Amino acid sequence: MTGTPLLSFEPLTEGILLKRYKRFLADIELEDGSCVTAHCANTGPMTGVLIPGQRVRLRHAPSPTRKLAWTWEQAEVPGADGQLCWVGINTALPNRLIRATIEAGCLREQLGEIESIRAEVVYGKNRKSRIDLLLQPSREAIDQRPIYVEVKNTTWSTGSTALFPDTVTTRGQKHLQELMDVLPEARAVLIPCLSRPDVTAFAPGDSADPRYGELFRNALDAGVEVLPCCFRFDRDGVTWQGTRPAQGQQPSAAL
């Protein structure tokens, strides 16, 4: 089902990134020469995808309830194959994208038939956490355990390997532990949302967060399933590119 369109939207506006600042803001020069300030949902370091002077794509959505009418959605970067490629950098999109992927049946082989999907469901030992997606298998499924899905937007890469995280993430560490905690009564699935089409594998970003890498390997040993999903980002939509294999450790060349 590679090539399946999953999301479509009004064509994005292209421009040139001037700078990002205060974590949430980016100044961008549009094609007509005007400059706008856009909201940047990705507050991390954006390793490898934050390049002043690069082409970017913005969504224009003016609203009385929004301070900024523009949102930074995509960035053009050098790809693993030497060609330029577009990367989805809006961290608000992956949960919606993975849900659309499941609903389209692209992960039927890995997850089975799914009867229902719930988002942001409270769970955890102290009931203070929320799982991104909670799936209920169909009545015909042999394995009736609920499926807890944690989604991670992944934009950093070295060579053709996608890496997460690109900085220390105590929140991400906590999510791995919580996935392990639901086993074996439920299935636990970590889905790295590979928001660039040029990668052929996924690995934990050990060089950015060694503790996360350690917990990632513990999670694999405990039975947490890792299902990297790859996508192509275009000006007017997002297309399914298939799953990618998960590696237990960041390639040595990148450490």
Swiss-Prot record:
Coiled coil: none annotated. Transmembrane segments: none annotated. Pfam families: SfsA (PF03749), SfsA_N (PF17746). GO terms for molecular function: DNA binding. InterPro entries: SfsA, SfsA_C, SfsA_N. Belongs to the SfsA family. HAMAP family: SfsA. NCBIfam families: sfsA. This is Sugar fermentation stimulation protein homolog. It comes from Synechococcus sp. (strain WH7803). The lineage of its organism: Bacteria, Bacillati, Cyanobacteriota, Cyanophyceae, Synechococcales. The gene is sfsA.
